[in-house]
Regions:
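Secreted/periplasmic carbohydrate-active enzymes, especially glycoside hydrolases
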Residues: 1-167
Length: 167
């Protein structure tokens, strides 16, 4: 029941149904060959300027020693303002100890944003960091790092944080 979270006027609840696997369960594992909502559903709110999507890719050099970490962050702005925001990324090891001395960061505004839809604009930002001698993931030693990506407004207030594991 989300009644307490509704505001006076129009409220929008979006539903997105994926027909492909996200690796959390194997498609067709239970012989269901249909689309639709047949599992648990969760609902959450997001800020008006938010991280719509992101990717983290670690690419090893030709000697398999060091890596280049490329992080792409897709921002959506429902305010359609040109305020400045900062995207920060911090990398943690398996014990959640920081790998970097300080977060990778980039500041951006939406002056050159593209239209996402009639209600929002969109901007993609990229962060890059060299990683010296990272632990390598393999089937024998499946080492995973955690990337935490934070979106902050011009006053340094955290608006949203997302994370993923990578290796």
């Amino acid at each position: 029941d989300i009644t307490d979270y509704l505001r006076e006027g129009e409220n929008v609840i979006s539903v997105q149904v994926f027909r492909w696997s996200d690796a959390s369960w194997v498609e067709d594992q239970d012989f269901i060959r249909l689309s639709g909502i047949f599992r648990d559903v969760s609902i959450y709110s997001t800020p008006e300027v938010r991280v719509r999507d992101f990717s983290v890719v670690a690419d090893l050099d030709e000697n398999y020693e060091d890596a280049t970490l490329d992080i792409e962050v897709d921002l959506t702005n429902y305010l359609k303002s040109n305020d400045e925001y900062t995207v920060e990324a911090m990398i943690y090891d398996e014990d959640f100890n920081p790998v970097l001395d300080s977060p990778i960061s980039v500041s951006t505004d939406f002056t050159d944003a593209t239209d996402y839809n009639e209600d929002a604009t969109r901007k993609v930002v990229n962060l890059t960091q060299e990683l010296k001698s990272p632990e390598k993931w393999s089937a024998e030693t499946p080492y995973l790092y955690t990337a935490v990506i934070t979106l902050k407004d011009s006053e340094g207030n955290e608006k949203e944080a997302v994370s993923t594991k990578f290796g």
